[in-house]
Amino acid sequence: MRHLILGAALALMLPLSAQAQDAGDAAAGEKAFAPCKACHAFGKNGVGPDLKGVVGRKAGVHEGYNYSAALKGSGITWDEANLKEWLKDPKAKVPGNKMVYPGLKDDKKLADVIAYLGTQK
C-alpha cells in the first residue's frame, strides 16, 4: 500500500516539474534579450515598438509605432504561447510583418526572454 501511495504522489508531482522546467529565468532572459535592444526598448519606440507592458497587450496597437497591416490585423494578444511562436519564427507566425529578426530557436532562451518581458510592466 505504501508503494501505491508513493507512486501516486510522484505521478501527481510530474506535471509540476514540467511546469518548473518551462518557467523562464528573467535574469537569464535579460542577457538573452541583449541583441533585441538594437531595435527595441522599454518606455519608448525605436526601430521596433516599445516593449514595456507587451505581455498581455494586443499586437499592433501600441501608440506611436507604424505597424505592418499584417500585424495590426493579426488579432494576436501577446500571451506566453503567442510570444513563444512569434519569437521562434516571426515570419511564420505573422506572414508579411516588418520584423527582420530570424527567430530564437533555443526553447530555454525563449522561456527566459518571455519571463524577462513579463517583468517589464
Q: How would you label these PLM feature ranges?
A:
Residues 49-69, 88:
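Solvent-exposed helix-loop boundary motif
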Residues 16-33, 73:
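Electrostatic cytochrome c docking/interface patches
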Residues 1-4:
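Positively charged n-region of N-terminal signal peptides that target proteins for export
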Residues 79-121:
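C-terminal capping alpha-helices of c-type cytochrome domains
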Residues 29, 33-42, 113:
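The canonical Cys-X-X-Cys-His
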Residues 63-84:
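Short Fe-S-cluster ligation motifs
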